Amino acid sequence: MTAPLIEGRGLTLSFGSERVLDQVSLSIHAGEIITLIGPNGAGKSTLVKTLLGLQKPDAGDVLRKSGLRIGYVPQKLAIDQVLPMTVKRFLTLTQRASRPECEKVLDQVGAAHVIDAQMSSLSGGESQRVMLARTLLLRPELLVLDEPTQGVDVTGQAGLYRLIDDIRHEHNCAVLMISHDLHLVMAKTDQVVCFNRHVCCSGIPETVRQHPEYRSLFGLQEADAIGIYTHEHDHEHDISGHVVGGCGHDHSHDHDHGHSHAHHKHDHHTHTRNDAASQQEAVTRK
């Protein structure tokens, strides 16, 4: 196996008398999708900051590929409603890019039609896609997504997960997703890491929910409520959730969410929402 893009070894960190990271080891390889799940206060954001070099650990080491390009997409972007800023302007705030370059990345994320729209007018799904487009201008090798489906409806969530998988394959970039959402984990995640100041357990989504530490952390009812199911679409939805091809029937009421159906593809894990707004940044680490 090739060397990881980024690797944390035995990371330990305390804030005063409180231990927030306890001997954490985690590695991320090119083309891999990892979802980090855990309750509020578990230290997920602190772990990510430590891996990215924004927080120094008390003990342990972080190894990064030389010149690693990292793109970060926050939970949401707080922009004043009265501040005039088009999507094109937002994409070029901290980097130079021509209009054709902006149109290309927006097209890749299914949002080419909003290039001249005001940022304040975008829906939750459109905002997430625009922020993804902004990171693609950097050609990231590692894409870090903090609660990527927050504020996005169920149809939009499925679309974002398909988009993330497409980006992973097209750009051969690794993806690290942070989630408080225990019911909804992307089915194509290569590894789910259950985290509460230390790595409780890890593996593919179907097996993590059976792990004793997972069930202990989130409770038996929450663990049993998780059902990852797979469906195949015979139609597509646009960014607003409207059917744009194939069958125009709304399948959302045709099936119980606890079993498989032949016409959809979704993944389910549980939610606790963190509503703190954060600013988008992209960092390049040497």
Predicted regions and their residues:
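Conserved ABC ATPase "signature" region
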Residues: R99-V114
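Conserved ABC ATPase signature
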Residues: Q118-L122, E126
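Conserved catalytic motifs of ABC-family nucleotide-binding domains
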Residues: R139
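Catalytic Walker B motif of ABC-type/P-loop ATPase nucleotide-binding domains
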Residues: L143-E147
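H-loop/switch region of ABC-family ATPase nucleotide-binding domains
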Residues: S179-H180
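H-loop (His-switch) and adjacent beta-strand-loop-beta switch element
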Residues: V192-I204
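ABC ATPase nucleotide-binding domains
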Residues: Q210, L217-K286
